[in-house]
Structure formats: structure tokens, C-alpha cells
Regions:
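Rossmann-like NAD(P) dinucleotide-binding subdomain of oxidoreductase/dehydrogenase enzymes
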Residues: 2-110
Length: 110
């Protein structure tokens, strides 16, 4: 659906149009129990669609995201396309309230 597709008559009198429009800066907050899998659900699609990404890994296991950043660099992704911020609750609050972050993906519970 990220290719600008059109689906006619998805419901009575309803057509579906999708547009590939980058949002700008997006962010993700990952849980401690899936420190690589959840970020891999989040940032690849976002950067493929033309956005930059800020990833906040769990402060309990920050190393997995560092490995992913190294793999991104090796694959030729330019510096600054995916960024990592470390921290706890205050960092998440900052991400959620920052006016330049246009979309946020969360995985986790209370």
C-alpha cells in the first residue's frame, strides 16, 4: 500500500487511495524483551518511505540497537537517517511531546 495504489469499491461507495508521502522525523520506543526484533518492525519501513528515524531502545538492553546501527552503516545508509537516543521515562516523554516528531511507534505495556 505504500506505492500509491488505488483500490476501487472497497466498500459501498468507497474507494481507497494511498499516497507515499514522507512524514519527516519518526520515532520508536522498543521494549527490553525484544531489543532487535521490534526495532526491525519499526525503522526499515519508515526509512524506506523517506523518513528519518529516532529509536529509543530499552535502557536495560541498549546493545542490540548499536549492532543494528553498525549494520545500517555497513549497508550504506547515510549517517543521521537512523539515530539512537538512550534514556528512560523522561526521554520517552520528550519523544512524545516533541513537535518535530510526526509519528511514533511503541511496543510495550505498563
Amino acid at each position: 500500500m505504500n506505492q500509491g495504489e488505488t483500490l476501487g469499491n472497497v466498500a459501498k461507495g468507497v474507494d481507497l487511495y494511498s499516497y507515499r508521502v514522507p512524514l519527516g522525523v519518526c520515532a520508536g520506543v522498543a521494549p527490553f524483551n525484544f531489543p532487535a526484533m521490534c526495532p526491525l518492525w519499526m525503522f526499515p519501513l519508515s526509512i524506506t518511505l523517506g523518513n528519518t528515524y529516532i529509536m529509543k531502545p530499552s535502557e536495560k538492553v541498549p546493545g542490540a540497537m548499536e549492532v543494528l546501527l553498525d549494520l545500517l552503516k555497513q549497508s550504506g545508509v547515510p549517517d543521521g537517517v537512523v539515530n539512537v537516543v538512550q534514556g528512560g521515562k523522561e526521554t520517552v516523554t520528550d519523544i512524545c511531546t516533541h513537535p518535530d516528531i510526526r509519528a511514533i511507534s511503541f511496543v510495550g505495556g505498563n
